[in-house]
């Protein structure tokens, strides 16, 4: 986490319309103070960029000594692995490998056993992508349940990056699918507010990017929980969509589609190009599914090929406008075929049989707790003849050789195993 003050008062409007107020610093540091702010490293850097664009001489965010702020006797107790002096380490070394990861114990971190009710603040998101956040929900739920074994009531709030986060509304919606989360708020948090909590967890450093283990296990380790002692059967995510406000017409579109047959979502593209199904092959797979699966209605939320028209094919790309729309669509499916995308993680939360076409070697570790997923691995057999560090597609050979071996019959056969 980063502790800082601002040189002049300023208001910032974030993407959902919320106004964040930053007031000019007033001493002292060691007491509850509405002008001392705490946020994640990434959010702090975004804030610095905003200040620089407004007036780089008038508006500055200046680092404070975190130990001085934490001397306040009312400052909450930290749970889990600590990353002190994060700003200094990242500015000097530019790499997370220089952090000293010291194992922590959740039980030994606690000190308010006499209280029936405790408040916990999580500072920062559990990852930045939809896939990371939804996967990590399993660890967050287990963390909450472990606390509930000790306290009669646990109020869990999460504060997420907001200063220049175009996905703030999306990220907030994802966390609001968790019934055990009390509230989702934008960063930064001031020291007066954080002192109302009993405990805090510093998620500014993404622990899952530092440990070569499954993302659920990584976050359990971060929370001070021995992931090896948690049964695999408990490492699942849940998504509550009862409160969703869907785009107009989407619900009826799904109802009408279900009357025509079983629904199969085909979702070939990831935000990471190397995890996506190449476009030409995605189009051919889509055509094959439409042609060979008469008892299914094929659904997409991506405009794969506007020229494809069929009675058993529905393109919902104009209806899938928000993360809530997309989660609802995925939750309505009977089966799913996808690349390694957020659809995979959402589907497992709803126990929907899913075929993942994976393109990276460590997919087994990533999917080890997904009981409703089958996988076809497409190996990257490409070779780059360029002698330079940068990639040159014109000098890459065999790039699609393994994709050419992937047959629609093999995809359908694997799908029918469920």
Question: What is the predicted function of each stretch?
Answer:
Residues 2-418:
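Catalytic machinery of carbohydrate-active enzymes
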């Amino acid at each position: 986490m980063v502790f800082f003050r601002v040189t002049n008062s300023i208001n910032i409007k974030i993407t959902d319309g919320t106004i964040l107020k930053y007031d000019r610093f007033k001493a002292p540091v060691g007491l509850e103070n509405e002008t001392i702010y705490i946020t994640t490293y990434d959010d702090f850097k975004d804030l610095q960029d905003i200040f620089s664009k407004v007036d780089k001489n008038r508006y500055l965010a200046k680092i404070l000594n975190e130990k001085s702020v934490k001397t306040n006797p009312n400052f909450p107790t930290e749970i889990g692995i600590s990353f002190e002096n994060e700003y200094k380490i990242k500015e000097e070394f530019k790499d997370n490998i220089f952090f000293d990861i010291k194992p922590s114990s959740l039980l030994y971190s606690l000190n308010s056993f006499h209280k029936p009710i405790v408040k916990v603040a999580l500072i920062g998101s559990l990852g930045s992508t939809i896939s990371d956040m939804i996967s990590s929900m399993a660890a967050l739920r287990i963390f909450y349940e472990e606390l509930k074994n000790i306290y009669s009531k646990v109020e869990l709030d999460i504060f997420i990056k907001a200063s220049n986060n175009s996905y703030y509304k999306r990220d907030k919606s994802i966390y609001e699918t968790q019934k055990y989360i009390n509230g989702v708020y934008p960063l930064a948090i001031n020291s007066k507010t954080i002192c109302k909590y009993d405990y805090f967890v510093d998620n500014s450093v993404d622990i899952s990017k530092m440990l070569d283990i499954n993302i659920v296990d990584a976050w359990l380790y971060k929370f001070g929980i021995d992931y090896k002692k948690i049964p695999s059967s408990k490492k699942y995510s849940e998504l509550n969509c009862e409160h969703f406000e869907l785009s107009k017409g989407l619900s009826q579109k799904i109802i009408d589609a279900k009357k025509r047959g079983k629904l199969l979502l085909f979702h070939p593209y990831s935000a990471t190009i190397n995890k996506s199904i190449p476009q030409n092959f995605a189009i051919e797979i889509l055509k094959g599914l439409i042609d060979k699966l008469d008892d299914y209605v094929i659904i997409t939320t991506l405009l794969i090929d506007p020229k494809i028209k069929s009675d058993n094919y529905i393109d919902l790309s104009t209806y899938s406008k928000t993360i809530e729309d997309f989660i609802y669509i995925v939750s309505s499916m009977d089966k799913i075929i996808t690349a390694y995308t957020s659809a995979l993680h959402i589907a497992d939360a709803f126990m929907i049989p899913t075929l993942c076409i994976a393109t990276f070697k460590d997919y087994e570790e990533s999917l080890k707790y997904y009981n409703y997923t089958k996988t076809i691995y497409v190996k990257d057999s490409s070779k780059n003849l360029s002698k330079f560090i940068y990639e040159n597609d014109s000098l890459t050979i065999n790039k699609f050789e393994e994709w050419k071996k992937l047959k629609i019959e093999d995809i359908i056969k694997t799908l029918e195993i469920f």
